[in-house]
């Protein structure tokens, strides 16, 4: 295994459940020599990705916060989604929370969240908190579009949880359940994550057609019961916004590719022109020698 990969494994040990690690504990967990683990910790501390906590123990360092700020400001998915999330909330007509989630190592991770001014409820999809793929609208709509190879491994690992989530008791039933979700391109659940809350989610795709994540609205179950046709209206607007976001990502990618091709073409023309006329500096030197 490559050194960089092993070092990343050290970094991935740090979680909400285990936010602090010693070099000795990390070495045992990953099957490393203590001297090797020491080098990895030293390099991660030098990069400010880890900091010393109490004696012999380490926590995540300030560099993580710097990268988080860069992600918030520069991630094109977040930048393009936030105006759409605000529009979704403004047009909903009820108090709600808008979520932007991305797939992260076969979990779903909220990367941006917006709420209406008087939304008096919290949601479990907190920013930066990995959530399972088999519960909740924001997760299930992503799970339905995961590639088959990864899906089979995931099923074998979480077979019992998938069965409890009413997604099938066999591999065949599981595939059929996901096929039904894919066919609607929208998924709505009530009370699967938070009691009394309804989640309405649609998928977001990369320019290559791979599943990136989901765009969602969370409203109170009471609001949907008290307003006829509200779920249909919100479902339609969420699906439309997700489609628009996918299209914007594709357009941005196409623009960048066209710009890159144009730049390469310009450089190629300059090289061809230089080859035809000779290098300008060399030509100038030859002229100066002739004059002398």
List where the protein language model places each region.
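Short hydrophobic beta-strand micro-motif common in sensory/regulatory domains
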Residues: 198-202
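Amphipathic alpha-helical effector-binding/dimerization core
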Residues: 60-157
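An N-terminal domain-start capping segment
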Residues: 1-22, 26, 87-115, 239-261
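Sensor-regulatory modules in signal-transduction proteins
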Residues: 204-207
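N-terminal helix-turn-helix
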Residues: 1-74, 78, 243-248, 291-292
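Juxtadomain coupling helices with adjacent low-complexity linkers
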Residues: 91, 184, 195-196, 212-272, ...
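Short, solvent-exposed recognition segments
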Residues: 120-193, 264-270, 277-283
């Amino acid at each position: 295994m490559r050194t960089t990969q092993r070092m990343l494994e050290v970094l991935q040990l740090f979680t909400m459940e285990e936010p602090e690690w010693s070099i000795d504990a990390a070495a045992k967990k990953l099957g490393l020599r203590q001297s090797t683990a020491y080098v990895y910790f030293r390099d991660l501390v030098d990069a400010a990705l880890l900091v010393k906590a109490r004696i012999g123990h380490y926590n995540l360092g300030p560099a993580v916060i710097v990268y988080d700020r860069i992600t918030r400001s520069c991630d094109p998915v977040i930048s393009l989604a936030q105006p759409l999330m605000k529009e979704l909330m403004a047009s909903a007509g009820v108090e709600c929370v808008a979520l932007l989630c991305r797939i992260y190592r076969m979990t779903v991770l909220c990367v941006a969240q917006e709420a209406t001014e008087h939304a008096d409820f919290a949601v479990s999809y907190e920013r930066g908190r990995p959530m399972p793929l088999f519960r909740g609208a924001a997760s299930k709509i992503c799970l339905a579009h995961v590639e088959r190879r990864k899906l089979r491994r995931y099923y074998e690992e979480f077979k019992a949880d998938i069965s409890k989530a009413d997604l099938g008791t066999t591999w065949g039933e599981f595939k059929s359940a996901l096929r039904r979700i894919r066919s609607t391109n929208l998924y709505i659940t009530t009370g699967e994550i938070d009691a009394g809350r309804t989640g309405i989610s649609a998928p977001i795709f990369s320019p290559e057609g791979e599943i990136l994540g989901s765009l969602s609205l969370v409203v109170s179950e009471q609001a949907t019961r008290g307003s006829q046709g509200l779920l249909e209206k919100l479902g339609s607007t969420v699906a439309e916004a997700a489609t628009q976001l996918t299209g914007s990502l594709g357009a941005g990618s196409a623009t960048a590719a066209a710009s890159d091709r144009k730049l390469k073409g310009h450089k190629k023309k300059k090289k061809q022109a230089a080859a035809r006329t000779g290098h300008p500096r060399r030509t100038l030197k030859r002229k100066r020698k002739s004059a002398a």
